[in-house]
Amino acid sequence: EEGSLILLDGRDNIKRKNSENGYFIGPTLIDKVKSSMKSYENEIFGPVLQIIEVNSMDEALKIINENKFGNGCCIFTSSGEKARKFSQNVNIGMVGVNIPLPVPSSFHSFGGWKDSLFGDLNMYGPDGLRFFTQRKTVTQKWPEESSESKGINLSMPNNLN
């Protein structure tokens, strides 16, 4: 309705018990999203990825940091300098660099900042001791220097090497 473009509709071909009332959605990819749209202003929990194109790093940081939520976001780049700047300046609890999800591993706490922080989901392991700190998790994946860029690789890391 607001002008975004659904590239992959998670409502298609859903055949699950109790899903007819909207309790389940498959992977959904939304392009041409603007920061003024309802889908961006509200935090969507589910396999939904929204794409906002920006003209600069500063514009990206401004859009993200002005949102009242702060759960997770991703950046795809071949520049370590840009990845560091983004990771250090974005007010988000979970940051992904060159991976489609910010926290792909169970040994990290799951939790955001701002209005995305809820309950005690950051309270396991050593994080229980860090309860009164504001934590940021940055998960990164970089291609080998000799490999040529073949576009964005959306595969998850499969080892810790």
Summary of predicted features, one role per range:
Residues E1-L5:
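Long, low-complexity segments enriched in small/aliphatic residues
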Residues L7-K17:
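Cytochrome P450 fold signature focused on the C-terminal beta-domain
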Residues K17-N161:
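Conserved C-terminal structural/oligomerization subdomain of aldehyde/semialdehyde dehydrogenase
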